[in-house]
From Swiss-Prot:
Pfam families: Fanconi_C. It is found in: Nucleus; Cytoplasm. It is linked to Fanconi anemia complementation group C: A disorder affecting all bone marrow elements and resulting in anemia, leukopenia and thrombopenia. It is associated with cardiac, renal and limb malformations, dermal pigmentary changes, and a predisposition to the development of malignancies. At the cellular level it is associated with hypersensitivity to DNA-damaging agents, chromosomal instability (increased chromosome breakage) and defective DNA repair. GO terms for biological process: cellular response to oxidative stress; DNA repair; interstrand cross-link repair; nucleotide-excision repair; protein-containing complex assembly. This is Fanconi anemia group C protein. Changing residue 529 to A: No effect on protective function from mitomycin C-genotoxicity. It comes from the Eukaryota. The gene is FANCC. Ubiquitous. Keywords: Cytoplasm, Disease variant, DNA damage, DNA repair, Fanconi anemia, Nucleus. Its main location: nucleus.
Length: 558
């Protein structure tokens, strides 16, 4: 590494001397010498760029004080600038010198000077050889006109691209595909310059009629990286075009979201919601093609984690943000619901899509029964070889899992016989892989536990041990994992809603949380419950206070 640094310094001095000689005398011999050495000079520039991109602008100036002179001499040498490759690498190197947040007038002047050099290169790219003579004739100094020239040039190119997009098959008025491709390549190092935003947007939105993508992959990657790191801000229409035209960028955006969720605090849905909204993915997912890719990546995450509750909660929050974005979208641009969920019953999707807030609370029970009937029909009464299956129905259901979380509350708040439809809904939600016999067994176990809990709610005294004992009653066999999780959540709901449950809540949770995994599960349940109550406007000060106290105490222990 040290040897590479020494070699680069020696090469730097050699090429600085060469450029000075070429600059001082424009003779036939110097022109021939320039052409003879262009390929070697380009190789030096590539090495120079690899070194510069690892430094900040201040370090670059400290290490190479005359770097500006070297690049300027190269940029004003027509025999070097005549090569597209030279233009591209020179732009890359110049962008490494830009100070994103100038702290003094010197840094601001350097940025203005770089803008001027970039304008000169772009002028050469567009074959505007008369630009310099024209501005000199008007009496303007470079520092005055170059920033404005860059902005106007960008706006002109953006306008030309928009016209190109509108002209469609009118080949006489369309910009050549090679030129569009060249523009996208030149833009790569300029992506984070605010003045270039209109051109970036126009390139993304401009769709050619060519059978293959004409924009450079490096352009898509650079734009996507800048968006993810919040270095640029583009209209949603441009972001959607980016992710539609370049699938790897969409996949990287999803992976970037996953990384943020993994590195953040566990079981905090408010923070998850902020990350999801900040990603722009719910808004972009209003386009079915993007939604399907995003949903497929969620599906893979769910399968790889064996249905982890945290993944399910994240899918539910994403779906909630997506539905909100869908409601705000223009009605003229809306797609049929079937395009988002092609493997499930449209009538089931329509019912699940209803927001509980828009339904009177007195009708929640009836809606839950209707959801159960539709799901049961799709899962148990489907014809052989029909599209979808139990998993697809369950996968759709968990998108709108708020309905499932309401079932336990509805059962515990009613003194009537537990409706079979609601018992089936709970059994299916917690055990999607179960067959009919296993699901029926879970329903019997849950019904027995509910009976004991309702009886205990009328008792004058409750004990943590009694409640823990009840959790294992109603069956002569050991509870399977899905049933255990379901009954734990029933007990937690009972503690939050039953008048006597508040006094023994902590003791019961202490007995329940005998592993770190179950502790995290309880934390997730409490956080999700508070999040849902807040969203639905459910007011229960006593229950809410208890849930917050339990959540706070449990988080200190993990």
């Amino acid at each position: 590494m040290a040897q590479d640094s020494v070699d680069l310094s020696c090469d730097y001095q050699f090429w600085m001397q060469k450029l000075s000689v070429w600059d001082q005398a424009s003779t036939l011999e110097t022109q021939q010498d320039t052409c003879l050495h262009v390929a070697q000079f380009q190789e030096f520039l590539r090495k120079m760029y690899e070194a510069l991109k690892e430094m900040d602008s201040n370090t670059v100036i400290e290490r190479f004080p005359t770097i500006g002179q070297l690049l300027a001499k190269a940029c004003w040498n027509p025999f070097i600038l005549a090569y597209d490759e030279s233009q591209k690498i020179l732009i890359w190197c110049l962008c490494c010198l830009i100070n994103k947040e100038p702290q003094n007038s010197g840094q601001s002047k350097l940025n203005s000077w770089i803008q001027g050099v970039l304008s000169h290169i772009l002028s050469a790219l567009r074959f505007d050889k008369e630009v310099a003579l024209f501005t000199q004739g008007l009496g303007y100094a470079p520092i005055d006109y170059y920033p404005g020239l860059l902005k106007n040039m960008v706006l002109s190119l953006a306008s030309e691209l928009r016209e190109n997009h509108l002209n469609g098959f009118n080949t006489q008025r369309r910009m050549a595909p090679e030129r569009v491709a060249s523009l996208s390549r030149v833009c790569v190092p300029l992506i984070t310059l605010t003045d270039v935003d209109p051109l970036v947007e126009a390139l993304l939105i401009c769709h050619g009629r060519e059978p293959q993508e004409i924009l450079q992959p490096e352009f898509f990657e650079a734009v996507n990286e800048a968006i993810l790191l919040k270095k640029i801000s583009l209209p949603m229409s441009a972001v959607v075009c980016l992710w539609l035209r370049h699938l790897p960028s969409l996949e990287k955006a999803m992976l970037h979201l996953f990384e943020k969720l993994i590195s953040s605090e566990r079981n905090c849905l408010r923070r998850i919601e902020c990350f999801i909204k900040d990603s722009s993915l719910p808004q972009a997912a209003c386009h079915p093609a993007i939604f399907r890719v995003v949903d497929e990546m969620f599906r893979c995450a769910l399968l790889e984690t064996d249905g982890a509750l945290e993944i399910i909660a994240t899918i539910q929050v994403f779906t909630q943000c997506f539905v909100e974005a869908l409601e705000k979208a223009s009605k003229q641009l809306r797609f049929a619901l079937k395009t988002y969920f092609p493997y499930t019953s449209p009538s089931l999707a329509m019912v699940l899509l209803q927001d509980p807030q828009d339904i009177p609370r007195g009708h929640w029970l009836q809606t839950l029964k209707h959801i159960s009937e539709l799901l049961r029909e799709a899962v148990e009464d489907q014809t052989h070889g029909s599209c979808g299956g139990p998993f697809e129905s369950w996968f759709l259901f968990i998108h709108f899992g708020g309905w499932a979380e309401m079932v336990a509350e509805q059962l515990l708040m009613s003194a009537a016989e537990p409706p079979t439809a609601l018992l089936w809904l709970l059994a299916f939600y917690y055990g999607p892989r179960d067959g009919r016999q296993q699901r029926a067994q879970t329903m019997v176990q849950v019904k027995a536990v509910l009976g004991h809990l309702l009886a205990m709610s009328r008792s004058s005294s409750l004990s943590a041990q009694d409640l823990q004992t009840v959790a294992g009653q109603g069956t002569d066999t050991d509870l399977r994992a899905p049933a255990q999780q379901l009954i734990r959540h029933l007990l937690l709901n009972f503690l939050l809603w039953a008048p006597g449950g508040h006094t023994i809540a902590w003791d019961v949770i202490t007995l329940m949380a005998h592993t770190a995994e179950i502790t995290h599960e309880i934390i997730g349940f409490l956080d999700q419950t508070l999040y849902r109550w807040n969203r639905l406007g459910i007011e229960s000060p006593r229950s809410e206070k208890l849930a917050r106290e339990l959540l706070k105490e449990l988080r200190t222990q993990v």
